[in-house]
Amino acid sequence: GYMYVDTLTYDKTGTKLYYVNPYGVLERNGWFQFSGHEFEAGLGFSGKAGGYGYANSDCSLSVNETRRFTDGTKVYMQGDGHMAQ
């Protein structure tokens, strides 16, 4: 089979979203930058290029909620895991 790289994917229940970085590793525990080439598994390009995301301790992405960015400003995390611009 093929390893997921640079991909947004859901768990088996379809409730938690994950990002597998270009090295095939799930992001975890904090802020990270999307590569700009990420794909949604089975759907093709996500339509969002780059930007920031936040991964929880279980590797799931923070979605549809407000967080504090590294500089302390409040930001909204969209349903696809990207920080709203």
Stretches with model-predicted labels:
Residues G1-Q85:
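Extracellular adhesion/carbohydrate-binding repeat motifs centered on closely spaced tryptophans
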